């Protein structure tokens, strides 16, 4: 179930949401929603019951679909009841061979298209919704329509939606249904049809089109939904004993404390009808699989909790494609469907194993690889680049799980003879080949996807190698600590989790290596760390809050705003509404901040990266035409789709609902936005031309005085590349090319090669902005009419903002002229100060820098010599502890280099064994520490690196080094005397204990 899974407390032990319902009870997904003044807990079903593959016992033989749609490979499995073959042999009149995943998807979409539904493409995995982390259901792209925030584009629609869910990632591969990536088939009605059609069509689709035996289908309905029960029984003909009435927690969907809500109904497939119906429990996952859910949005929940019928009743449904494929293809789990299994087969061949004969552990690992590769390919295709934050971390984590799992099962090399190469691209090739039907854009982004995966894998392999080194150090430390306190050496759960999460070390490998060294692993502590991360991931990824607030209710009564700003910067309009602090008012007086709604406007509202216009609204007298009010507009935003909200301050007089006003946009600022917006289009084309067509936009800002463009690329741009990009843009600017704008069908625009803007939603008709021969983009922003109006283009900076994402900031138009003039003025001042011509500035600066470097080196050398002279006097102050010479001193304001020289001098001057610990505070708020131990001290087992690092913590810092020499620093100079006293006590104690 889609909306229910997202929005309501309707799924506890029996989730209506396909593919998202197999976690143990402890792993439920909770969404807190306010209902009738109390908090309600939503659980996406996480059944506590154990599951078999399909509920068969002993050694079962099942027919499994593979990369060839009709391959019929025999697979041995083990479960709990009769054979899978017998459990599925009655499915459909057609053989399982004709039911490929693509065929199921096409049949579903064509079925509803024949019944008046518009087939719409899947939306991005990156939702246009700040309340949702990733797209986790098919209804997300229609949420604003269901909540009344946007007008319906079509009366009814059908989709196959790409979805991602990662909060139960540890169960992937271990159950028959858990996946991170899945497809949700859905049909949606926006007031066009309702319960009867939804139910009868769902039944016709499953029994006639897909051929599922009616006697194997069970139905659940909301306990009070007599209408649905009647339709299922009296019109469809389902026996009463196979229709279960369930409560509000299972079968009622609500969007929040108030707003649209309604009952839902689910269709289950029964693998074992011979068990009878007297005590059948739809929550028995070994027997039933819920594959289709229908949500009937028929009520509006009021503030007092009462329900009133909606004027527009909606339908939201969801069918898990992988679940239906599992049923029709007669395989024991979702992974062995032809949607995933070709990736698994490729991974098995690269690991030199056969999936058919592999043990359960190997199969689990191969399933993890197959699932995760689908997820990362689609995420990267949708613009999510591996990083350490947000969605990028999801991709990085999935990639690292594939890499470490692949290495665990023996995959080495790229599959093409290169043992040092990356193997992810070879697996991704298979995933991309399976993507054509659901997302044709994936193929066009092949090069970018493969490159990103290769770079990330090779980087992670280096991280793994660093992890191996860290593990060795942690084991040394555990053994050392145990030796000092007489305990048993143990690797903490926190350290095990660090190795697992940051360095990708499988826990079993950590445990194995630790065992070889005689160190036990704190698995309880590790499990606690994993649970904490799971809770954080769950909270970040799956909480969806929907509510229709007071302001939204007010704005819903306002008509859409007619935008005039493409052709005019001024217009007469009528005030349709006023908001002050979110409350509706009829009149607003001087000095107040206000949000104004007009029936039409020349002001551009912020969207597509372009900021909203600034300007003024004027109110004139009806009789004397004198100016009565002035409102300064400093921002314009969109609300509920196409309602423009003019935000500003009443500078003079008052404004009233229903009155006529004159609107005037600040022409200078608008021209700046136009120049920067067109320059942004040219910049993107230049980037594709210079560094490669696979680069794509990852975000943008078009302001009045600058532009910012984020793009996907794996390295910094060179100075030469930046110069070429800048030169190319300026070449296009000087060509004085006229821009062309036209409105086209979305698909026609894409076919013509138009580039879609990052994160934007598009309707059936789109506006296309073209610089002929240079750029063509889908864009609703404002632009210059001729590239010459841009005047010039200058890149200000280029930098990385995340892993795989770069940012260019630049200026154009008047801002370009101002920038160049300012830089010219700086150069004049510099020439005057250096007393050289502009062309000689670089040479003069290099000379000054070289002189400065020489002077600094001389100063550093003198300081070191002074420190050594001071150290000479310290040698006489050395104390002797059990034949070991010890010096612990504060050397005042000596810098780090001088301190190092002094320590080296002392340890060389004193007879072995000798230990020297020196500290200083150069006066810049910092502390320097150094420890130098002679070979004799090191042989005692006293290491300089560990010793000085511990002392440095007292000074608010840290450090380390080799056993014989180490340096550290800190930021608390006031603690230095106490730290050195502690150092003296500890080195004396350490030497004394070793000598005894």
UniProtKB/Swiss-Prot annotation:
Its biological purpose: Catalyzes the attachment of alanine to tRNA(Ala) in a two-step reaction: alanine is first activated by ATP to form Ala-AMP and then transferred to the acceptor end of tRNA(Ala). Also edits incorrectly charged tRNA(Ala) via its editing domain.
Entry note: cofactor: Binds 1 zinc ion per subunit.
One of the GO biological process terms: alanyl-tRNA aminoacylation
Self-association and partners: Monomer.
Coiled coil spans: none
Entry keywords, A to Z: Aminoacyl-tRNA synthetase, ATP-binding, Chloroplast, Ligase, Metal-binding, Mitochondrion, Nucleotide-binding, Plastid, Protein biosynthesis, RNA-binding, Transit peptide, tRNA-binding, Zinc
Highest taxon, organism lineage: Eukaryota
Cofactor list: Zn(2+)
Organism listed in the record: Oryza sativa subsp. japonica (Rice)
The enzyme's E.C. designation: 6.1.1.7
UniProt note: domains: Consists of three domains; the N-terminal catalytic domain, the editing domain and the C-terminal C-Ala domain. The editing domain removes incorrectly charged amino acids, while the C-Ala domain, along with tRNA(Ala), serves as a bridge to cooperatively bring together the editing and aminoacylation centers thus stimulating deacylation of misacylated tRNAs.
GO cellular component terms given for this protein: chloroplast; cytosol; mitochondrion
Cellular localisation: Plastid, Chloroplast; Mitochondrion
An example Gene Ontology molecular-function term: aminoacyl-tRNA deacylase activity
Record-given protein name: Alanine--tRNA ligase, chloroplastic/mitochondrial
A Pfam family per the record: tRNA-synt_2c
InterPro entries for this protein: aa-tRNA-synth_II/BPL/LPL, Ala-tRNA-lgiase_IIc, Ala-tRNA-ligase_IIc_anticod-bd, Ala-tRNA-synth_IIc_core, Ala-tRNA-synth_IIc_N, Ala-tRNA_ligase, Ala_tRNA_ligase_euk/bac, Ala_tRNA_synth_plant
Chemical reaction(s) catalysed: tRNA(Ala) + L-alanine + ATP = L-alanyl-tRNA(Ala) + AMP + diphosphate
Enzyme class (EC, first level): ligase
Positions bound to Zn(2+): 677, 681, 779, 783
């Amino acid at each position: 179930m889609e909306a229910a899974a997202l929005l309501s407390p309707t799924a506890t032990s029996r989730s209506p949401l396909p593919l998202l319902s197999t976690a143990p009870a402890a792993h439920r997904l909770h969404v807190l929603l306010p209902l009738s003044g109390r908090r309600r807990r939503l659980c996406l079903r996480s059944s506590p019951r154990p599951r078999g593959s399909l509920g068969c016992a002993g050694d079962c033989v099942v027919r499994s679909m593979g990369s060839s749609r009709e391959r019929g490979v025999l697979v041995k499995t083990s479960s709990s009841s009769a054979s899978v073959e017998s459990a599925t042999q009655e499915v459909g009149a057609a053989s399982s061979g004709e039911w490929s995943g693509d065929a199921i998807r096409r049949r579903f979409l064509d079925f509803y298209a024949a019944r008046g539904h518009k087939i719409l493409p899947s939306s991005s995995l990156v939702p246009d919704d700040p309340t949702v982390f990733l797209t986790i259901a098919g209804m997300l792209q229609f949420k604003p329509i269901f909540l009344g925030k946007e007008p319906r584009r079509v009366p009814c629609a059908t989709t196959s939606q790409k979805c991602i869910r990662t909060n139960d990632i540890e169960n992937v591969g271990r159950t028959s249904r858990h996946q991170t990536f899945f497809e949700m088939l859905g049909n949606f009605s926006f007031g066009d049809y309702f319960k009867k059609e939804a139910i009868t069509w769902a039944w016709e689709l499953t029994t006639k089109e897909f051929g599922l035996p009616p006697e194997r289908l069970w139905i659940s309905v909301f306990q009070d939904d007599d209408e649905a029960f009647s339709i299922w029984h009296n019109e469809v003909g389902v026996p009463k004993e196979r229709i279960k009435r369930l409560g509000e927690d299972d079968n009622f969907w609500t969007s929040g404390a108030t707003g649209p809500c309604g009952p839902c109904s689910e269709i289950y497939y029964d693998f074992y009808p011979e068990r009878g119906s007297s005590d059948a429990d739809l929550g028995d996952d070994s027997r039933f699989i819920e594959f289709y859910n229908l949500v009937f949005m028929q009520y509006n929940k009021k503030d007092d909790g009462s329900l009133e019928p909606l004027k527009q009743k909606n339908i939201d449904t969801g069918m898990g494609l992988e679940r239906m494929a599992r049923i029709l293809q007669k395989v024991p789990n979702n992974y062995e469907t032809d949607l995933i299994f070709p990736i698994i087969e490729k991974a098995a061949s690269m690991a030199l194993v056969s999936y058919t004969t592999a043990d359960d552990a190997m199969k689990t690992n191969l399933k993890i690889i197959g699932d995760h590769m689908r997820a990362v390919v689609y995420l990267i295709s949708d613009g999510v680049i591996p990083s350490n934050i947000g969605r990028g971390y999801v991709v990085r984590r999935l990639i690292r799980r594939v890499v470490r799992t692949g290495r665990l099962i023996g995959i080495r090399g790229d599959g093409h003879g290169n043992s040092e190469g990356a193997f992810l691209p070879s697996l991704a090739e298979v995933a991309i080949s399976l993507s054509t039907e659901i997302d044709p854009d994936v193929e066009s982004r092949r090069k970018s996807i493969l490159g990103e995966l290769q770079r990330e894998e090779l980087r992670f392999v280096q991280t793994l190698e660093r992890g191996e080194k860290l593990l060795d150090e942690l084991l040394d430390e555990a053994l050392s600590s145990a030796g000092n306190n007489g305990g048993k050496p143990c690797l903490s759960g926190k350290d095990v989790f660090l190795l697992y999460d940051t360095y990708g070390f499988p826990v079993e490998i950590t445990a194995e290596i630790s065992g070889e060294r005689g160190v036990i692993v704190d698995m309880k502590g590790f499990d606690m760390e994993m649970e904490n991360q799971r809770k954080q991931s769950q909270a970040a990824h799956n909480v969806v809050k929907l509510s229709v607030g007071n302001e939204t209710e007010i704005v819903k009564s306002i008509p859409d705003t007619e935008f005039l700003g493409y052709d005019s910067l001024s217009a007469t309009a009528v005030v349709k509404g006023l908001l002050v602090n979110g409350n509706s008012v009829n009149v607003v007086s001087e000095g107040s901040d206000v949000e104004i709604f007009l029936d039409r406007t020349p002001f551009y509202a912020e969207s597509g990266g372009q900021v909203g216009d600034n300007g003024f609204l004027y109110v004139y007298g009806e009789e004397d035409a004198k100016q009565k009010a002035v409102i300064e507009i400093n921002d314009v935003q969109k609300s509920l789709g196409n309602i423009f909200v003019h935000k500003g301050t009443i500078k003079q007089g008052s404004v009233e609902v229903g009155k006529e006003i004159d609107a005037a946009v600040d022409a200078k600022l608008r021209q700046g936005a136009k120049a920067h917006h067109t320059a942004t289009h040219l910049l993107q084309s230049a980037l594709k031309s210079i560094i490669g067509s696979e680069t794509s936009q990852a975000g943008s800002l078009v302001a009045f005085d600058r532009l910012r463009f984020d793009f996907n690329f794996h390295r910094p741009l060179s100075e030469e590349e930046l110069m070429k990009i800048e030169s190319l843009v300026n070449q296009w600017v000087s060509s004085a090319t006229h821009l062309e704008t036209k409105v086209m069908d979305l698909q026609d625009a894409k076919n013509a090669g138009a580039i879609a803007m990052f994160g934007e939603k598009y309707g059936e008709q789109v506006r296309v902005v073209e610089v002929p021969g240079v750029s063509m983009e889908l864009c609703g922003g404002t632009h210059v009419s001729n590239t010459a109006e841009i005047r010039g283009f200058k890149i200000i900076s280029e930098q990385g903002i995340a892993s795989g994402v770069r940012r260019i900031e630049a200026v154009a138009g008047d801002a370009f002229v101002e920038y160049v003039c300012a830089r010219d003025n700086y150069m004049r001042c510099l020439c005057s100060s250096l007393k050289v011509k502009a062309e000689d500035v670089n040479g003069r600066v290099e000379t000054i820098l070289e002189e400065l470097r020489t002077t600094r080196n001389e100063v550093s050398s003198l300081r070191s010599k002074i420190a050594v002279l001071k150290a000479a006097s310290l040698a006489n102050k050395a104390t002797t502890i059990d034949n070991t010479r010890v010096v612990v001193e504060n050397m005042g304001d000596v810098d780090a280099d001088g301190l190092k020289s002094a320590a080296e001098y002392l340890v060389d001057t004193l007879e072995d064994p000798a230990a020297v610990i020196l500290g200083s505070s150069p006066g810049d708020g910092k502390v320097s520490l150094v420890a130098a131990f002679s070979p004799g001290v090191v042989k005692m087992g006293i290491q300089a690196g560990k010793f000085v690092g511990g002392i440095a913590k007292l000074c608010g810092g840290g450090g380390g080094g080799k056993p014989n020499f180490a340096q550290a620093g800190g930021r608390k100079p006031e603690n230095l005397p106490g730290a050195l006293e502690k150092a003296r006590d500890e080195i004396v104690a350490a030497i004394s204990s070793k000598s005894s």
